[in-house]
Structure formats: structure tokens, C-alpha cells
From Swiss-Prot:
Record family assignment: Belongs to the peptidase S1 family. Snake venom subfamily.
Protein name, as recorded: Venom prothrombin activator nigrarin-D
Domain Peptidase S1, first and last residues per copy: 210-453
Residue span, EGF-like domain: 86-122, 129-164
Species for this entry: Cryptophis nigrescens (Eastern small-eyed snake)
């Protein structure tokens, strides 16, 4: 028989056995929370769950395919992988002038804003204003590789540093009548004739001759001035530059003793109802070469018309309106780099409707393309000086004619119209193989400004 002490120990052990079991073994529901394997997620949102990228690619090296399984998106995978392999090449901001950097493996790519190029967008295309005029609405100047835009008189530079804002209702070069049209800078007569510049016709219509020309509607040639002699007959044209200045040709001035001026009219058949403006003074360029002068010991008809430019000062100011607006005076660089590279210029006048015919009572207008200098010089039997340029057609019968002399050659840039030439001379009117010859206004900008500044 077991000793009493051993029996007591056995009974005590058996009594505490259920409690010991409960402390050693977990209930199945609780145990499963620790022992059951959690299924991995491959959803697109896994990249936002802490530890996934670190577990796959930071704590241990991963493959691109493993990264792809995490992101399940090619673009996000590429972005991550380029940085993961060799670091972020864009961290130093290598793209200049607000270019956008995209990282690559061992490289980067800059996407440049317009007008910049180069690996780092470091090259400024507009540094010399030769591309799209530096994005300037009017004048462009390059200063230390920076573009400086400026505007014609009566305009101010816009807040963007490129646009030009008119400071008045009748700022220069504004074709007010055409502004509400779909193509605001091109009046009806320009839109009607744009196709002529794109094709040549073996049988051109006589309706499109400048000497039989298209009518300029009221307000579409607002810078046009008309010069009348003492008999109130039209003898030349002109261009309004300011309220007291009209630009014309020097060879017009000696054709009459008295000059009066008409502005804002497209029909001058009833001159008695039209206001004639008196002239105060006329300034002719001192270097003007008349068509006939003593050459050696002989009278030689040279017909050079060099320096064929004059300015008329009005006795009373011209009143501006929708139908009377001055043309803008350009800069010489702007003419050379921009205006003379346009498709065409605009010529208007009350001149003869045919060679040696009668002058027109209605204002006529035509668009004429610029002619390269070599072609111009080869076409003429007379000298073409550096102060002249040619415009017109060699085959189409379109040209200015007698009575149009002194009138405007205008070139539009955007919605602004600039004076680029003075109708000077030609060999006949619309003669085949010949062009109209115009005084190159850009050569006389300082002279014009000097005369206009006189009191």
C-alpha cells in the first residue's frame, strides 16, 4: 500500500491537470490566426500597402518582373525601375527653361517648351529673333540671348511680354472694319485674291487687274490719302502716318503748284461734297534723283527715281475715325526679317484703270507678292537701287499705274498693317515680264522720324 504522502501528491496533480492544459494549448480559432498563411494580394493598390516594395525590392534584390507584379502597370513599373537600377537622373534638374525631365537607365530625356531645344533645352531658338519673330507681335530684339519685344507707336507691350495692346480706338495699322471677320487681318479684297498668289493662270481674268482693280470697301484702306492739284484732279496718292503727316513720292511734288489732300473716301466722283485738307509744308528728300537730269553734257532720261520719298505736313490735323487710320511705321530690322518675307503686300490708289487711260473715281486695291532682288534687277531696263524693291506679277496683268504714284504699299503682320513701300515707278502698267517698283521705306525710317519731329 502506497504511503499516504505519495497518494496526496498524485491526487493534487490530477486535480490541477485541466488548468495546466488550458494554459499550454490555444483554442483552435485563436491558434488559426497565427498559424494560417495569409494569401498575398496582387491588386493595383498593393503599392500603397506598407512593406510590399520593401519586401520585394529593398530588403532583397528583385527582378523587373517582380516589380511588375507589384505595380501591375507598365508606366509605373518603368518609372520605379529606372530609379531603382541606378538612381534618379532627374534629381539635379538638368532641363533648362522649365523643360520636363524623364528618368532613364543611365540617362534622362528633356521635353522642351516651345522655342527651346537641345539635350537640356539649353538652346533658345529665338535668341536672334529669326524664328517666328521671337513670338513678338510687333518688333523683336535680341539682348544677351534674351528676347525683348516692343510695339509700334500707339501700342503698349502686353503683360505677357509678347503681345501689343492698342492704346486708343484709332491706333495705327488697325483695320477696324475687318476686325469682326473670321480672318480679321485680311479684308475682303485680300481674301478674294489669296488664291491668285498660289497659282498662275494662262488666261487671267481682266477683272483682277490692279489697273482695272477691285474696289476697296469703306474702311478697308483707312491709311489711303489722295493728292489733288489746283484743278482738283487726282495726280498722286499718299499714306497717312499721323494726324499731320502724309507720306508720298518725291516725284509727285513738282507736278503742281498747289496740293490739297483727301482722306477717308473711296469714291471721289463728287469732289464738291468732299472736304479738301490744306497743306502747310512739303519735305522732299535732298538726295532725290529726278527722272531726267543733266548727265555729262547731255540730257539723259535715267529714270532712277532714287530717294523717291517726301512728307507732306498738313495745315489742320486729320480727324481719325473707322475710315481714317494711320499706317504703322516699322523698324528697319522688322521689315527685313519679317515683313518682306510675307506672301504679299497691299497696294491701293485712284490711278488709271488702264495704261494711258482715265483715273478711277473709286479706290482700287490689289495684293502683290514680293519679288526677290535678283529677279527684280534682271527684269528692268533701268537701275534698281538699294532704295527700291519690286512687287507684282511677271505674267498676270496686275499692277499699279499712273495716278497711283506716291500711294501706299502696306504689309500686314497679324492684325497690324505697316507701311513698307511707296509706289514709285514702273515700265508701263501690268506689262508682261515687268514689275512695279517701290521706294523701300525701311531705308528711310530715321529720315521719316526726323521730319515728323520737326515743329
Amino acid at each position: 500500500m502506497a504511503p499516504p504522502l505519495l497518494l496526496c501528491l498524485i491526487l493534487t496533480f490530477l486535480w490541477n491537470l485541466p488548468e495546466a492544459e488550458s494554459n499550454v494549448f490555444l483554442k483552435s480559432k485563436v491558434a488559426n490566426r497565427f498559424l494560417q498563411r495569409t494569401k498575398r494580394s496582387n491588386s493595383i493598390f498593393e503599392e500603397f500597402k506598407a512593406g510590399n516594395i520593401e519586401r520585394e525590392c529593398i530588403e532583397e534584390k528583385c527582378s523587373k518582373e517582380e516589380a511588375r507584379e507589384v505595380f501591375e502597370d507598365n508606366e509605373k513599373t518603368e518609372t520605379f525601375w529606372n530609379v531603382y537600377v541606378d538612381g534618379d537622373q532627374c534629381s539635379s534638374n538638368p532641363c533648362h527653361y522649365r523643360g520636363t525631365c524623364k528618368d532613364g537607365i543611365g540617362s534622362y530625356t528633356c521635353t522642351c517648351l516651345p522655342n527651346y531645344e537641345g539635350k537640356n533645352c539649353e538652346k533658345v531658338l529665338f535668341e536672334s529673333c529669326r524664328v517666328f519673330n521671337g513670338n513678338c507681335w510687333h518688333f523683336c530684339k535680341s539682348v544677351q540671348n534674351e528676347i525683348q519685344c516692343s510695339c509700334a507707336e500707339s501700342y503698349r507691350l502686353g503683360d505677357d511680354g509678347h503681345s501689343c495692346v492698342a492704346e486708343g480706338d484709332f491706333s495705327c495699322g488697325r483695320n477696324i472694319k475687318a476686325r469682326n471677320k473670321r480672318e480679321a487681318s485680311l479684308p475682303d479684297f485680300v481674301q478674294s485674291q489669296k488664291a491668285i498668289l498660289l497659282k498662275k493662270s494662262d488666261n487671267p481674268s481682266p477683272d483682277i487687274r490692279i489697273i482695272n482693280g477691285m474696289d476697296c470697301k469703306l474702311g478697308e484702306c483707312p491709311w489711303q490719302a489722295v493728292l489733288l492739284d489746283e484743278d482738283d484732279d487726282v495726280f498722286c496718292g499718299g499714306t497717312i502716318l499721323s494726324s499731320i503727316h502724309v507720306l508720298t513720292a518725291a516725284h509727285c511734288i513738282n507736278q503742281t503748284k498747289n496740293i490739297s489732300v483727301i482722306v477717308g473716301e473711296i469714291d471721289i466722283s463728287r469732289k464738291e461734297t468732299i472736304r479738301l485738307l490744306p497743306v502747310d509744308k512739303v519735305y522732299v528728300h535732298t538726295k532725290f534723283v529726278p527722272p531726267s537730269y543733266l548727265y555729262g553734257h547731255q540730257n539723259v532720261d535715267r529714270k532712277t527715281y532714287d530717294y523717291d520719298i517726301a512728307i507732306i505736313r498738313m495745315k489742320t490735323p486729320i480727324q481719325f475715325s473707322e475710315n481714317v487710320v494711320p499706317a504703322c511705321l516699322p523698324t528697319a530690322d522688322f521689315v527685313k526679317q519679317v515683313l518682306m518675307k510675307q506672301d504679299f503686300g497691299i497696294v491701293s490708289g485712284f490711278g488709271r484703270t488702264q495704261y494711258r487711260g482715265q483715273t478711277s473715281n473709286t479706290l482700287k486695291v490689289i495684293t502683290v507678292p514680293y519679288v526677290d532682288r535678283r529677279t527684280c534687277m534682271l527684269s528692268s531696263d533701268f537701275p534698281i537701287t538699294p532704295n527700291m524693291f519690286c512687287a507684282g506679277y511677271d505674267t498676270l496683268p496686275q499692277d499699279a499705274c499712273q495716278g497711283d504714284s506716291g500711294g501706299p504699299h502696306i504689309t500686314a503682320y497679324g492684325d497690324t498693317h505697316f507701311i513698307t513701300g511707296i509706289n514709285s515707278w514702273g515700265e508701263g502698267c501690268a506689262k508682261k515680264g515687268k514689275y512695279g517698283v517701290y521706294t523701300k521705306v525701311s531705308n528711310f525710317i530715321p529720315w521719316i522720324k526726323a521730319i515728323m519731329s520737326l515743329k
